[in-house]
Amino acid sequence: MATGKIVQIIGAVIDVEFPQDAVPKVYDALKVESGLTLEVQQQLGGGLVRCIALGTSDGLKRGLKVENTGNPIQVPVGTKTLGRIMNVLGEPIDEKGPIGEEARWDIHRAAPSYEEQSNSTELLETGIKVIDLICPFAKGGKVGLFGGAGVGKTVNMMELIRNIAIEHSGYSVFAGVGERTREGNDFYHEMTDSNVLDKVSLVYGQMNEPPGNRLRVALTGLTMAEKFRDEGRDVLFFVDNIYRYTLAGTEVSALLGRMPSAVGYQPTLAEEMGVLQERITSTKTGSITSVQAVYVPADDLTDPSPATTFAHLDSTVVLSRNIASLGIYPAVDPLDSTSRQLDPLVVGEEHYNVARGVQGTLQRYKELKDIIAILGMDELSEDDKLVVARARKIERFLSQPFFVAEVFTGSPGKYVSLKDTIRGFKGILEGEFDHIPEQAFYMAGSIDEVVERASKM
């Protein structure tokens, strides 16, 4: 293939000059003689191309030779990637030797056509009460975990991977986009301890890496997930964190000379998000169910980045700092979280009525809190006292010990089936457990455990 040379280096953006009759295409991967990979972003005319470095540009100098590979970045796909940790280029970073893949796919691929897509209303049971009841996941759907810093997005995601791998024995792909290296390390050890590592492919582009790596690592993970889907499997695709994907795009956009738009984001924000999200879909062969953690800057859900993500999701799980401050984990806000699946035609009348009953009771309690704060509980009517008592039990019963958090909580994790979840909340709403003290409901699994606990109090 054609050879060019570096003519300008501005941080992560590199300009390379090629002969005019052999200019690389946009998204072609170029190899610098030092071993660094570049990706073409713009053709500037006169044989010049502007590229993003997928690695540090330290030590580069003008005049270095650059070779065009003639293809976009290609990464290993298939079952050989399971249990391995790779970087954005699909190179192993776990010191376990080469991957030995059977095939390599381009990371830039077209989304499935309209005819190939399928829609399913089958529910995916997660074993987490609040999610299964209030914002159920669809098999092949897209889920967003929204939350500010430190409210438990990563822990929730780890629990979902563990539950689904063990209870549904499915394959998962985890893309760590611009998150802390420590979290990636914890995640790896957690998967090893839960014996599910052989069912997960891990792709990391961490916080300390150049923007090119963080921008493309989500596509690397998605390509691996697409291969499993096209083999007829139901695969889970986890992204932590989709906000960092946007942020990497913002960093690169300014260096490429584009005008910034609202709040300094790149003008192509909606398009970049769409290109990624449209590929995460289910076809007639298999399904990709995706769970995406979305960092919410300054807890502001109207920020352009989380707001753009909302449009693509089927379920939104909103993690609330107020609930976390009460010590209730998972800190999912049952009044803010939504799901397209929460429809009597999909989940059935009983599930729908119980979920709405739970939300109604909690909403009423929220309204009464001001009165309680000023006048105290004694001023409430008997009916309202009952609502408050039940709401407090529901709040506590929405908490649950996680398997992946056993180290912190000291209590064994619980997986609660959807049937048991509905039975428990239905009982609370109907007053079946009015005689049980509210502390018995805190950090419990099924309702049977609550009853057993209460008998010992």
UniProtKB/Swiss-Prot annotation:
GO MF terms held by the record: ATP binding; ATP hydrolysis activity; proton-transporting ATP synthase activity, rotational mechanism
Record membrane topology: Peripheral membrane protein
UniProt entry keywords in alphabetical sequence: ATP synthesis, ATP-binding, Cell inner membrane, Cell membrane, CF(1), Hydrogen ion transport, Ion transport, Membrane, Nucleotide-binding, Translocase, Transport
Residue pairs linked by disulfide bridges in the UniProt entry: none
Gene3D superfamilies referenced in this protein's UniProt entry, alphabetically: 2.40.10.170, Bovine Mitochondrial F1-atpase, Atp Synthase Beta Chain, Chain D, domain 3 (1.10.1140.10), P-loop containing nucleotide triphosphate hydrolases (3.40.50.300)
EC number: 7.1.2.2
Catalytic activity of the protein: ATP + H2O + 4 H(+)(in) = ADP + phosphate + 5 H(+)(out)
SUPFAM superfamilies assigned: C-terminal domain of alpha and beta subunits of F1 ATP synthase (SSF47917), N-terminal domain of alpha and beta subunits of F1 ATP synthase (SSF50615), P-loop containing nucleoside triphosphate hydrolases (SSF52540)
Pfam families attached to this UniProt entry: ATP-synt_ab, ATP-synt_ab_N, ATP-synt_VA_C
InterPro entries named among the record's database cross-references: AAA+_ATPase (IPR003593), ATP-synt_VA_C (IPR055190), ATP_synth_F1_bsu (IPR005722), ATPase_a/bsu_AS (IPR020003), ATPase_alpha/beta_chains (IPR050053), ATPase_F1/V1/A1_a/bsu_N (IPR004100), ATPase_F1/V1/A1_a/bsu_N_sf (IPR036121), ATPase_F1/V1/A1_a/bsu_nucl-bd (IPR000194)
Family: Belongs to the ATPase alpha/beta chains family.
Database matches in PANTHER family: ATP SYNTHASE, ATP SYNTHASE SUBUNIT BETA, MITOCHONDRIAL
This protein's name: ATP synthase subunit beta
Organism: Actinobacillus pleuropneumoniae serotype 5b (strain L20)
High-level lineage: Bacteria, Pseudomonadati, Pseudomonadota, Gammaproteobacteria, Pasteurellales
